[in-house]
Amino acid sequence: MRRLTAPLVAAWLGLSGVALASLAVVTPAEAQQAGGWRKEVADKAKAAQEAGQAGNYKEAIRLLQEAKAKGPLQPAEEQGVNELLIWAASGAKDYRLLAATIEERLATGRVRGNDQIQKLNVLAGTYYTLGDLRKTVSTTEQLIKARGGTGTADDLILLGQAQFQLKNYQAAAATLEQAYPAARRAGKSQAIQVKLLETLNAAYFELKNDQKRLETLHQLMVIQPKTSVFDQLVSQYQRTSANDPVAMINLYRLGARTNVLAKDHFAKYADVALDVSSPGEAARMLERGMASGAIARDDRNQRLLADAKQQLEALKKGLDQQEREARAIPAGEQDARLALTFYTLGNYAKAAEAAKRALEKGRLNRPDDVHMLLGVALMELKRGKEAIPSFEAAEKANPKVAGVAEVWRDVAGG
């Protein structure tokens, strides 16, 4: 299987501009009023502020570094000069200086409360911008601790991404499991939620945790179905169901319904549809595949299409008799076959009715198959909430289809 990768978190958080975040700057005038300033330091700070306000941040930095060279700074001087230096470094996009100056401020022990949180927030993002992932992690952990132990969605996204890039997949998975619901609560965009789940999926791939991967892929199918996601589900369920035809046809039905079938899925769907005696589905997939270029218009496929259409016509001709016989028989198997006939003909309301009768009568070869057919027919009728119990029943009836039933249930409830 191809290696999964995580998207860059900078695209989610706008970290390229993180150093421009507003920070509380103590001006020389304010600091002098509090006392403890030497005139030569205050003069340099004032000149630096004027240079920065004029857009000359490099000159401001030079003047502030000269002020710091005047000997050990008193607490008031340190606060005023370094706050201005943080501001100037931000303006100059000198991220290394910005990080070093924030670290110096924090090391004094005089930065507390919201000011500490704000500085740690900027520092964590700055380290990520600089590519220092270990310091990104440690600083974000400090930030979460400063917030009282509960990180914001942005904190968790940044921490999880940095952990993933450091290949600490266990820690990344644990963090991203918190980040996704936090992002939803915070009203983050669908694109951010998708990227979070994609990174979480990649972490579980590296950890070889198939069960958690499937749970994550199910969530992705709910919020934004993609061919890449669906293709992974097909690979997983081919293996876990041992290519069970009921599991696979219902998975392909989901892919077709959400328009995420990969090129090779059209022919596979058609093949399994013919195997389970659903020629209408086979014909539809062959035609769609040929129209999209996914299936070659060669003699073999043309014969398959013609054969599927011929079978479909035979079903139409015998439909009335099949329905009379199914209703007359006390066991449910004939109604189950009738339900499939109606489904393959595209009559989903009649398919649902026949499937319900089959389940009421019982004595079925594959109850899970009938539960799935009922659920999918109800989905086609836009009755998703009604379909959920059918998928839950299929999930309990047969472990081979449990995963496919679960993803259908999740989509129905989403």
Language-model segments: which ranges?
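Structural motif corresponding to the intra-repeat A-B loop/turn of tetratricopeptide repeats
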Residues: 54, 92, 130, 166, ...
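Generic helix N-cap/helix-start motif at coil->alpha-helix transitions
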Residues: 37-46, 75-82, 112-122, 148-158, ...
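N-terminal leader/linker segments that initiate helical-solenoid repeat arrays
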Residues: 2-8, 20-104, 108-118, 407
